[in-house]
UniProtKB/Swiss-Prot annotation:
Listed result of changing residue 1085 to R: No effect on interaction with UBL4A. No effect on interaction with UBL4A. Abolishes on interaction with UBL4A
Ranges of Pro residues composition bias in the record: 200-210, 251-262, 393-407, 427-438, 507-520, 588-599, 656-680
Free-text tissue specificity from the UniProt record: Expressed by immature dendritic cells (at protein level).
GO CC, one annotated term: cytoplasm
Keywords: Acetylation, Apoptosis, Chaperone, Chromatin regulator, Cytoplasm, Differentiation, Immunity, Nucleus, Phosphoprotein, Repeat, Secreted, Spermatogenesis, Transport, Ubl conjugation
Protein name listed in UniProt: Large proline-rich protein BAG6
Nuclear localization site (motif): residue ranges: 1012-1054
Organism: Homo sapiens
Amino acid sequence: MEPNDSTSTAVEEPDSLEVLVKTLDSQTRTFIVGAQMNVKEFKEHIAASVSIPSEKQRLIYQGRVLQDDKKLQEYNVGGKVIHLVERAPPQTHLPSGASSGTGSASATHGGGSPPGTRGPGASVHDRNANSYVMVGTFNLPSDGSAVDVHINMEQAPIQSEPRVRLVMAQHMIRDIQTLLSRMETLPYLQCRGGPQPQHSQPPPQPPAVTPEPVALSSQTSEPVESEAPPREPMEAEEVEERAPAQNPELTPGPAPAGPTPAPETNAPNHPSPAEYVEVLQELQRLESRLQPFLQRYYEVLGAAATTDYNNNHEGREEDQRLINLVGESLRLLGNTFVALSDLRCNLACTPPRHLHVVRPMSHYTTPMVLQQAAIPIQINVGTTVTMTGNGTRPPPTPNAEAPPPGPGQASSVAPSSTNVESSAEGAPPPGPAPPPATSHPRVIRISHQSVEPVVMMHMNIQDSGTQPGGVPSAPTGPLGPPGHGQTLGQQVPGFPTAPTRVVIARPTPPQARPSHPGGPPVSGTLQGAGLGTNASLAQMVSGLVGQLLMQPVLVAQGTPGMAPPPAPATASASAGTTNTATTAGPAPGGPAQPPPTPQPSMADLQFSQLLGNLLGPAGPGAGGSGVASPTITVAMPGVPAFLQGMTDFLQATQTAPPPPPPPPPPPPAPEQQTMPPPGSPSGGAGSPGGLGLESLSPEFFTSVVQGVLSSLLGSLGARAGSSESIAAFIQRLSGSSNIFEPGADGALGFFGALLSLLCQNFSMVDVVMLLHGHFQPLQRLQPQLRSFFHQHYLGGQEPTPSNIRMATHTLITGLEEYVRESFSLVQVQPGVDIIRTNLEFLQEQFNSIAAHVLHCTDSGFGARLLELCNQGLFECLALNLHCLGGQQMELAAVINGRIRRMSRGVNPSLVSWLTTMMGLRLQVVLEHMPVGPDAILRYVRRVGDPPQPLPEEPMEVQGAERASPEPQRENASPAPGTTAEEAMSRGPPPAPEGGSRDEQDGASAETEPWAAAVPPEWVPIIQQDIQSQRKVKPQPPLSDAYLSGMPAKRRKTMQGEGPQLLLSEAVSRAAKAAGARPLTSPESLSRDLEAPEVQESYRQQLRSDIQKRLQEDPNYSPQRFPNAQRAFADDP
């Protein structure tokens, strides 16, 4: 292409330019080139030196991408530093929907449907070929052959998170630059005196390879209307550019099946502080360019309330465009600062120093939204995942790839925000292909290039009889041998010895498969059993990756089975539903007929899918529901999507069709009070009574779980077979040493210390065991829990009932505000005292839990602890539902409100999705509530009710204590429907331990001699005052400014400890904090320090220090702080 000289000036120009090129490995190279050389020629000139082909180079200067047809001198880069990043070459045309079977990733999600259209001003953001998401599909045989899964999670050099942050910032800077260029070229702004356009234009627009998600508008003419945060389009488009790199037309030689990432070195690639400074300087320049538009922005918004645009349509459009563009620029600018704000440089390190981050990127990663689903599906695209598969299969037709192109597929799926990359369906690797009838194990390698997790895995359980175009044939009978149970048992022992792989044998396959998308459905009955195990296997593998990586994960999902539409051989996004019914299969070798259950409705299937993926199949309605080829749904971290798949998979090997798998039981009772992260289930049935897994010994189950988990944990650096604690695991990955330490940030008080104890003693295997109803981990932790409660809960006192009640009150005194805040915005049943009701209820429940922990020493400790948690959960839900007049929406609002308050700092989209899921699950639980009204009416307290015989003492203890109900309910309330049913089958929960309220009340009244001298209604009030004054929660000293604004009466009643003015107290406190001991006895040291002359000298020194500080503090004003002035500045 010839250079464009239209912008050349008549000014005398130098003959040569010295250009410095900095690459992502922090190396800077200097090139001297001719001044008339254009950018494209310059790229070719430096290609050999930087080892990056010219078509993959992207040169960035001051946040702008250098255009190939411009001359270098137009950008004024002489003597300046240009940043070079590598990207995939732009496509010259769109793929045709199916490429030449090399396993490439160019097929669009809709199997060749055209990409989403873009606005005229839109720009496609090229992305550096790392640190973003690569999605793909892989297929599993259904003939019972094994699947060898290698999960490699080594980080690529670009995955230095500080480097990723800088690259992200540079990308957003480029986006802002594009918006500024558009604003600077608007004629109406120039007429108003706006800045003149610079020699800048949007980056080149390589043709899109995948359709844009429905919810995303990538910098269109109205960018402010985009629903998605800025990183979404960038990351989505990164996939667009990585995918074409794998296109067979651009990749020389036969490529292996699946994407082939560019080779990287293993050396760390941390950026230097100087690079950070350059980015900040560029941001400063952008802010200065934005200032003129901001001024106009202020003017337009200032007059927007009253401006009349009736006769000025053009002016209105111009102002609206300005508002949109400036608003979008501010959003990108703010997100850029957010991405950079966590970068730090530790000056204590030895040179050369580099940047590090103080908060993981997942804190800011925003999921994309699939609006086609029944509820929005969040998809996190913040990392790179490449999935490659190799194996043998019948050779495809020359032009057919995994998703066969055809109108059937396009009609059966909907546009999605993900790019489906077929990695296991491509042509066989080089070499002679075996006969079609031969089936070998497939190897699926999932390469995860970041500690930050991924998320898109499409899985299709492929029929072994696939015909040459990817068309599955219909088997005529069960293909699985009767010995699948033995096969599984033989495979499992290999787990600990081969920690880098997981070997899975599939249970009985389905009787029939859907036919080709273009043809009619295959005649025959779809077997729910086989499809259930298909989905279970998909969930096990795909859920496993995300379950342990603490991010949303895509797992298998299918379309409803009432009239299953044709499905492609490769899974893809579902068109309008998120329904899947995963059920346990029949006995191996037995009749493969589904149980004769009526077909559930569409809504039932939706609930089945939601509950099935989050907490296991939901009730009998899910059984036998035929589903089509699995596609997509979402499993949240902290909920056992993987566990459900494991459960179904293991249950398929039992000798009889088992009931639904056990729901996740709650963690130990105290943890329920601690407000764990959103999404972690805290409620469920304690015993797996009568369930399929009961026949599995804990040792066998542990070996299975350990083998599966060791695959990922080994990839993350854990030793094979090690039982690394959750705290150690997170500390090692985060690089921080103060996570889960008592007293550290986020671990305050008793509950924080308890959570720390649990995380330090539980491994991930223990958590899986607990979630499946095995209480052995709790039983093992009994000594530590008992010691912890004795020291932190009772303060070393004897565990008598009165001491336990007093300790509960002390612990909960500061939590009452949470109860009040939680119910402040909902309508409570008239006459009900919701605060007192919850406090007394929680008091009683926690007393029984604490008494059990402190007193129980037998082998029933763990089982009883889970039972107490379940009892408290259901009664709490039933009680508050009654107090809210039976309004489920009000109860859901209370729970979701607490979740939002607890989730400050968590991605808002994720929180919104979580609250939606909680509401759906809560509805199922309440429909099967095992606790009747009679069981909870005794807890209800009404306004003005005379104190019940004893309510007060437990109330107080309770009062403060039960403030934790909300945290507990939010985390625990969303229990699975199966949990409620199991609890119902066990009968009403047992009465709480301890005597009745009346007995306790009577005892309390008898122990208070003054109670008879006052009116009965005053007794509880006086008792509460006595207890609250006796046990005031300590708080740190308050500042002078805070105290000066506090009412005098409140200030006088403050019980917080102020600064210690006595030398003996100050020295003893400092010595205790430092762990120092006096040379003499503490008593003699205290006597010496209490001498009047020493005390007076200390007071004078303290006064002098404060006076000096006040004189040097520019913010101190005697008029504003008169008390400080009188106390310290004036002469005595």
